[in-house]
């Protein structure tokens, strides 16, 4: 039996659509959308972010963790 491939839904970068030039580490509500329930950073192939904004999100999350605004682990 032949299986048909499903077309992948093309995800667009939400941060590009919002026209953000800078991802602020103090915006924990936005940053928490890019974390799993255990506190790990979601990869860009799942979020649909472009490379530029994924790097900004990564750096902002790491800064927020260091400042104590976001937890390293969620238990």
Curated annotation (Swiss-Prot):
Q: Which PROSITE patterns match?
A: RIBOSOMAL_S18
- Gene3D superfamilies per the UniProt record, alphabetical: Ribosomal protein S18 (4.10.640.10)
Matching entries from InterPro entries are given as: Ribosomal_bS18 (IPR001648), Ribosomal_bS18_CS (IPR018275), Ribosomal_bS18_sf (IPR036870)
Give the function comment from the record. Binds as a heterodimer with protein bS6 to the central domain of the 16S rRNA, where it helps stabilize the platform of the 30S subunit.
Q: How does it assemble?
A: Part of the 30S ribosomal subunit. Forms a tight heterodimer with protein bS6.
| Protein's name according to its UniProt entry | Small ribosomal subunit protein bS18
Q: Which GO terms describe its molecular function?
A: small ribosomal subunit rRNA binding; structural constituent of ribosome
Give one GO biological process term. translation
Cellular component, GO annotation: cytosolic small ribosomal subunit
| Record keyword Lipid biosynthesis present | no
UniProt keyword terms in alphabetical order: Ribonucleoprotein, Ribosomal protein, RNA-binding, rRNA-binding
What family does the Swiss-Prot or TrEMBL record give for this protein? Belongs to the bacterial ribosomal protein bS18 family.
């Amino acid at each position: 039996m032949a299986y048909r491939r499903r077309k992948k839904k093309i995800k667009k970068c939400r941060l590009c659509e919002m026209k953000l030039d800078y991802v602020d580490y103090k915006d924990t509500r936005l940053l928490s959308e890019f974390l799993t329930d255990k506190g790990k950073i979601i990869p860009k192939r799942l979020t649909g972010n472009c490379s530029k904004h994924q790097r900004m999100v990564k750096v902002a999350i790491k800064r927020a963790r260091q400042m104590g605004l976001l937890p390293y682990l969620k238990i």
